[in-house]
Amino acid sequence: RRQRQMCIRDRDKDITINPGCTEFIHIGIALEIPTGLVGLIYARSGMACKRGLAPANKVGVIDSDYRGEIMVALYNHSGEAVTVSKGERIAQLVLAPFITADFTEADSLEDSVRGEGGFGSTGTH
């Protein structure tokens, strides 16, 4: 079964984004995301790969208690000005489960196989 995705479109006007700049794209809708879910705004692959545009914060997060208009902050990674046309699909929204946790401050942690090994500590193959 093909999964449906919500494509986010600019609704108002054409917007030109200069190289190295960010513009907030107003899409003209607000959502009531159910409690326990979060909305994640991702780049559309064509916008990023072909035109150099991607969400400025890499992944936009829409909490379930947010009720305002959804906007996408698009950053121009290319070396030239790029125009986003009115109605153009600019991003995609994915709903995902969201788990909250209560953390407790501790003086020590349980040992693990990995331990304190950070970046690159698990090998490359």
Task: Pin down the residues of each PLM region.
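Glycine-rich active-site loops that engage anionic ligands at enzyme catalytic sites
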Residues: 24-82, 91-97
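Helix-rich terminal scaffold detector
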Residues: 89, 99-125
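Short loop segments at secondary-structure junctions
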Residues: 14, 77-79, 124
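Short, small-residue-biased leader/transition segments that mark boundaries at the very start
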Residues: 1-8
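Solvent-exposed alpha-helices and their adjacent loops that cap or buttress functional pockets
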Residues: 16-17, 62-66, 111
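Catalytic strand-loop segment that frames the active site of acyl-thioester-processing enzymes
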Residues: 5, 13-17
